Amino acid sequence: MRIAIMTDSYLPTRDGVVTAVMTLSKSLRDLGHTVFIIAPDPGEAHRESGVYYFPAMKFKKYPEYYLPIFPSGKRKLIESLNVDIIHIHGIAFMALKGLIVSRSTGVPSVATYCTNVVDTMEFYSPLPMPTEIQGRLAWIYMRNFLKRPSCIIGSTPATLTEFEENGVRPKRTAVIPVGIDIQRFRLGLDGSEIRKRHGFTDEKVVIHVGRVSYEKNIGVTIKSAKYLPDDVRIMIVGKGPAFQDMKDLVKEEGLEDKVIYTGFVPDDELALYYSASDVVVSASRFETQGLTITEAMACGLPAACSDGRSFLDVVEDGVNGFFFKDTPEECAEAIMKCLANKDRIAPLARKTAEEYSMEATGKKMIALYESVVSDVKTS
């Protein structure tokens, strides 16, 4: 098949959407399909060969993101690619462009719901109005947007449940998680060099991976260090708009010896960082899947996660990890349970991750594409 992936965010931005696009495009190409990535233009210095770009400008509230200029004269470019299906990632400007091209060409579109937009309003919205009102307006927009593609894809069942609760009525839905490379993220990797690099000897290491942003609730993870034994360290991997504020919080809480920040870590080292650790943690209630949790599980790590949204579909309490509520004390308790049960949980965590292999999810996606294309042709 010839597949156009239109995404609201792409490299050099690093987030779950970008990872999802990169992973999906690789899995589809490995299966013998042709994939075209279409993204906002980050400027000449950051362009990648083989990616089609729409003119864009930086988003002032979050300068790591780029907003495509609307309208633009690039629609004919997409039409010239002669694709069988358009796969939209996001609900903003690139997504709207995808719908316009789909309608003008008759090429069916599907959309992956990647981001819980309402949860970001408090932190990044440029609109001068109460967050509650913005949230209601966002759901009005999403109810209108999400009924237009031929199918809406959620990474977990929790996403589709949230649609139902907020009156979203897509034409069709499917649950297909973002895949992971289970050959790259695996048991038995040697993380000793990473431990040495960051000054760890016999300490237990709890890792948090992802954008350091306000909606990720990282403050709970940081404060949990106060309730952990002296030989436990929290390692926060990644950067983002809350990076400096979270570093300041560590200092304010007097936790400089127990919480370390690595900043951005290259993709080719990430699996080693997981393997250098003992537990993966996330206090976020924002995730549509929690991709880094699955990656860590593939490396045998038990997961200490908040008991909300998509984590409920990935983590089984007491089997491959432990849940906690919203307090630092409860987070610390879940971490200690993970540490105490690490050897028992490691193979179970790996077994969970294997269900999310790139190959398996890529095949599911192709089957969905073929079904959607067939339905459109016969309708």
What are these regions (language model features)?
Residues 1-56, 366:
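N-terminal subdomain of nucleotide-sugar transferases
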Residues 19, 204-227, 241-247:
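A conserved mid-protein helix/loop that constitutes part of the nucleotide-sugar donor-binding site
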Residues 146, 264-265, 272-277:
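Short alpha-helical donor nucleotide-sugar binding micro-motif in glycosyltransferases
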Residues 285:
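Aromatic "clamp/platform" in nucleotide-sugar-dependent glycosyltransferases that forms part
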Residues 317-318, 322-328, 336-342:
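Conserved acidic donor-binding segment of nucleotide-sugar-dependent glycosyltransferases
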